[in-house]
């Protein structure tokens, strides 16, 4: 009986030891935080991993870089990933937080197919952010002055995702898992655009991925991106600058609500878009007016309303007639509210969208004007 008990104890001890069968020696791994993917002139993939370097107190004091860029090439994504180990430690992707796709790659190739390996890979998290580079993606991962202590570019891109509550020109972060769902379900969508400006990574508008081809068809400016965030009801903050009789005025967004109601008229959809925004008059350089005056505030509200309506019309016209695609998910409103009509048009929705009419009801409410009236 005692012998049986001893064997039982030994058996369970062996099971516990087996729990470390897949252990990885961290000194033999590269911890990637960002990955830039570009298409080369010979149509191969160029991968640029941005890897963390271990930092001691001495290395921080001496100003040694905290990251290193590791580049590899391959005819397929996986070949390029595996070729990293030829010259550097294998990449450990558990900490990979942002994937940046180059402009040439996205214009020429199906984005969903490019991401196929990363969606299948159980080591990489689907919550990693997806962004579009204006130009080469690898350029965004470089810094201007190599002798200066600067933030890791990929870390900066990650940190900036939290700023959408302060600046409406920053999109709600798009994750690779969500992008794959959009592509698989036949949606066009927007993707945060970034660029290298004088050696620093900077958010700069949005790229448009078109349904069907899943390719990049163009970019929107930062201002146009903010306008579409208003239309989609995703705007969380930011400002709208304009002028009153030549004097600068600025409205700070505190709360905004969007309602979209499609109706079918003569066999065509008409979208009624209502946007109601509350905020603060944070800047008023008109020396001849008084913010304590209700009539003056109403006039300014009307100025902001007309500006937003003008901006919305311009960017929607661009989507309809230049890019001919719906990256703001208006199709969902048709699908949900008019399912029979949707079944007839879903196969050629982009063509229907290009001929769609819009009616706008935009209102601004100034709820505060700061600590001074003039």
Curated annotation (Swiss-Prot):
Lipidation (N-palmitoyl cysteine): 20
Cellular component, GO, one term: plasma membrane
Record keywords, A-Z: Cell membrane, Germination, Lipoprotein, Membrane, Palmitate, Signal
Coiled coil ranges: none
Taxonomy, superkingdom: Bacteria
Topological relation to the membrane, as annotated: Lipid-anchor
Any single biological process term in GO: spore germination
Subcellular location: Cell membrane
Lipidation (S-diacylglycerol cysteine): 20
Family that this chain belongs to: Belongs to the GerABKC lipoprotein family.
Job of this protein: Involved in the response to the germinative mixture of L-asparagine, glucose, fructose and potassium ions (AGFK). Cannot stimulate germination in the absence of gerD and gerK gene products (fructose and glucose receptors respectively).
Descriptive protein name: Spore germination protein B3
Gene: gerBC
């Amino acid at each position: 009986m005692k012998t049986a008990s001893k064997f039982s104890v030994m058996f369970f001890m062996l099971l516990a030891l087996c729990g470390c069968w897949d252990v990885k020696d961290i000194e033999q791994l590269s911890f990637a935080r960002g990955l830039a993917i570009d298409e080369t002139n010979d149509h191969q993939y160029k991968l640029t991993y941005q890897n963390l370097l271990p930092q001691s107190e001495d290395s921080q004091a001496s100003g040694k870089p905290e990251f290193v860029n590791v580049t590899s090439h391959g005819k397929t994504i996986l070949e390029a990933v595996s070729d990293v180990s030829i010259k550097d430690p294998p990449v450990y992707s558990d900490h990979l937080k942002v994937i940046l796709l180059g402009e040439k790659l996205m214009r020429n190739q199906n984005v969903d197919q490019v991401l196929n390996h990363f969606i299948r890979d159980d080591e990489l998290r689907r919550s990693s952010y997806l962004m579009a580079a204006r130009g080469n993606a690898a350029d965004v991962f470089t810094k201007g002055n190599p002798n200066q202590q600067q933030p890791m570019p990929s870390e900066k891109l990650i940190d900036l995702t939290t700023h959408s509550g302060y600046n409406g020109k920053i999109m709600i972060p798009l994750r690779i898992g969500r992008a794959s769902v959009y592509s698989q379900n036949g949606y066009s969508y927007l993707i945060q655009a970034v660029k290298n400006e004088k050696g620093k990574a900077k958010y700069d508008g949005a790229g448009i991925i078109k349904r069907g081809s899943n390719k990049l068809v163009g970019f929107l400016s930062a201002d146009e991106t903010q306008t579409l965030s208003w239309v989609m009801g995703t705007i969380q903050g930011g400002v709208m600058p304009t002028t009153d009789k030549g004097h600068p005025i600025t409205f700070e967004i505190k709360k905004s609500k969007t309602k979209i109601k499609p109706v079918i008229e003569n066999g065509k959809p008409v979208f009624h878009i209502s946007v109601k925004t509350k905020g603060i008059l944070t800047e008023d350089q008109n020396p001849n007016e008084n913010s304590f005056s209700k009539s003056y505030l109403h006039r300014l509200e009307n100025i902001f309303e007309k500006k937003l309506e003008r901006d919305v019309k311009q960017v929607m016209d661009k989507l309809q007639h230049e890019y001919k695609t719906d990256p703001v998910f208006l199709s969902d409103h048709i699908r949900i509210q008019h399912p029979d009509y949707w079944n007839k048009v879903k196969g050629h929705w982009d063509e229907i969208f290009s001929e769609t009419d819009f009616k706008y009801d935009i209102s601004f409410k100034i709820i505060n004007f700061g600590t001074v009236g003039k």
